[in-house]
Regions:
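Basic/aromatic-rich interaction segments and small domains that mediate binding to polyanionic partners
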Residues: 2-46
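Short intrinsically disordered terminal tails
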Residues: 1, 49-52
Length: 52
């Protein structure tokens, strides 16, 4: 699944408006590969789905 980050740009972790690939969904949270730090879990409300 591809999602677009709709939150604030966060210290080079995630960039507002950028699309990210969801590696897995865990208890409603998305595991995405960040811009700099590897992959982490983030709450789904911070993203909008671009492609399922």
């Amino acid at each position: 699944m591809t999602v677009k980050y709709i939150g604030k740009t966060r210290n080079m972790e995630l960039t507002n408006g950028k699309c990210y690939e969801v590696l897995s969904v865990e208890r409603g949270w998305y595991r995405v590969k960040t811009d700099m730090l590897g992959d982490y879990l983030y709450p789904a409300h911070l993203f909008e789905i671009v492609e399922e």
